[in-house]
């Protein structure tokens, strides 16, 4: 198979056994299919098409699912696609993704013509998820010195990599000219670079590694490399994770948890004043994502975290549910079970993670699960009770 190939899909609809919520499985359970990273754009603006990664052709490539026609068009081919970091352009005309840890690619969604926007220098490796600004004219990413890089194919290697203090740099790439500039370079594992929506001068990034060992995870820096500031000082025994910008740029939301405390806390940072406040207590969700203005949040219940060193202080019962939190009403809703295994699969630590997010109309939640076999894509309906 090759780019442009169309794959017919048969959707499977069922009622969740615990909540009665309508859930639709979009992809077959005998082929690895997964969504992109939860804060990267995956839906067309009108919700009609969905970007995802899949192994229909052997390698993991990008596909575009037409939800009305129930078919998927292959967008990329060959080995080496980072099928988590890719995203759709604001006007739905292109896919951007990184191939072979080196080439930043743009795929025209009409012609499927592909071109290289930027190439990582030979002595560096492109790492993680790269994120564009709101206008999609530039992108921030992380590069790691090639001599320091090791593939992080399981959580043990993830933890070990932290202690190597790899040489990392936060870069900015002009998506028109392909020119790159270094914003920050440190002998410290850096990750999660994200432009603040609507504010190109504010770039967030993190100190990566086991959450209980990282001194301060979240940082802001100006786009020109000035005014680097610590977003918050961790409390004693506190871990912070899975930070994201509310899509309207009003706040950065993150998950906080404490040693010997089974609760999780949804917290919010003001991007200007750095005021840190607790929004609510929640069940043990791993990832969170919001709707456009941050009034609704969705999270995936999880087991004890694997990305800590001292796991003895973080034991919890596995929670298999998806939760929606209405911050206006203060109510919490269990909408459906994801029942995923969270297992590492084919050397990938993320492919079985639900990574839930809302559809553009906020009426459904997209997530990944391997409950029926291999990882597949699902849509769970947001019940009317969430709005009341």
Swiss-Prot record:
Species: Pectobacterium atrosepticum (strain SCRI 1043 / ATCC BAA-672) (Erwinia carotovora subsp. atroseptica)
GO-annotated biological processes: pectin catabolic process
Record keywords: Lyase, Periplasm
General function of this protein: Involved in degradation of pectin, which causes soft-rod disease in plants.
Identification of the protein by name: Oligogalacturonide lyase
PANTHER family: PROTEIN TOLB, PROTEIN TOLB HOMOLOG
Places the protein is found: Periplasm
InterPro entries: Ogl_dom, WD40/YVTN_repeat-like_dom_sf
Pathway: Glycan metabolism; pectin degradation; 2-dehydro-3-deoxy-D-gluconate from pectin: step 3/5
Pfam families cross-referenced by the UniProt entry: Pectate_lyase22
GO MF annotation list: oligogalacturonide lyase activity
GO cellular component entries: periplasmic space
Residues annotated as transmembrane: none
Catalytically driven reaction(s): 4-(4-deoxy-alpha-D-galact-4-enuronosyl)-D-galacturonate = 2 5-dehydro-4-deoxy-D-glucuronate
Assigned EC number: 4.2.2.6
Keyword Lyase part of the UniProt annotation: yes
């Amino acid at each position: 198979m090759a780019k442009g190939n169309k794959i017919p899909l048969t959707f499977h609809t069922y009622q969740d056994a615990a909540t009665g919520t309508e859930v639709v499985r979009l992809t077959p359970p005998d082929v690895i299919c997964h969504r992109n990273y939860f804060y990267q754009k995956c839906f067309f603006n009108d919700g009609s098409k969905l970007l995802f990664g899949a192994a229909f052709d052997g390698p993991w490539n990008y596909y575009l699912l037409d939800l009305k026609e129930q078919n998927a068009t292959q967008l990329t081919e060959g080995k080496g696609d980072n099928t988590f970091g890719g995203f759709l352009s604001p006007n739905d005309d292109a896919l951007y993704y990184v191939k072979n840890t080196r080439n930043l690619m743009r795929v025209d969604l009409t012609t499927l013509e592909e071109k290289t926007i930027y190439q990582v220098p030979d002595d560096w490796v492109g790492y993680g998820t790269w994120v564009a600004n709101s206008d999609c004219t530039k992108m921030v990413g992380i590069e790691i010195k090639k001599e320091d890089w090791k593939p992080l194919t399981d959580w043990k290697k993830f933890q070990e990599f932290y202690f190597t203090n790899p040489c990392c740099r936060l870069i900015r790439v002009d998506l028109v000219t392909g020119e790159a500039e270094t914003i920050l370079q440190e002998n410290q594992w850096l990750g999660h670079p994200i432009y603040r929506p609507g504010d190109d001068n504010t770039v967030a990034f993190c100190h990566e590694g086991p959450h209980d060992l990282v001194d301060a995870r979240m940082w802001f820096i100006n786009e020109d490399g000035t005014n680097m500031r610590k977003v918050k000082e961790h409390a004693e025994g506190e871990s912070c994770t899975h930070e994201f910008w509310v899509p309207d740029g009003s706040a950065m939301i993150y998950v906080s948890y404490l040693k010997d405390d089974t609760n999780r806390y949804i917290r919010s940072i003001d991007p200007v004043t750095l005021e840190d406040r607790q929004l609510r207590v929640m069940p043990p969700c791993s990832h969170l994502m919001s709707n456009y203005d941050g009034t609704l949040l969705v999270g995936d219940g999880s087991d004890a975290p694997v990305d800590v060193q001292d796991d003895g202080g973080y034991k919890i019962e596995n929670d298999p549910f998806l939760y929606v939190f209405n911050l206006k009403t203060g109510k919490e809703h269990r909408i459906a079970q994801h029942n995923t295994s969270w297992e590492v699969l084919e050397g990938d630590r993320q492919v079985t993670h639900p990574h839930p997010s809302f559809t553009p109309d906020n009426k459904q939640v997209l997530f990944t699960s391997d409950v029926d076999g291999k990882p597949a894509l699902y849509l769970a309906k947001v019940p009317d009770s969430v709005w009341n």
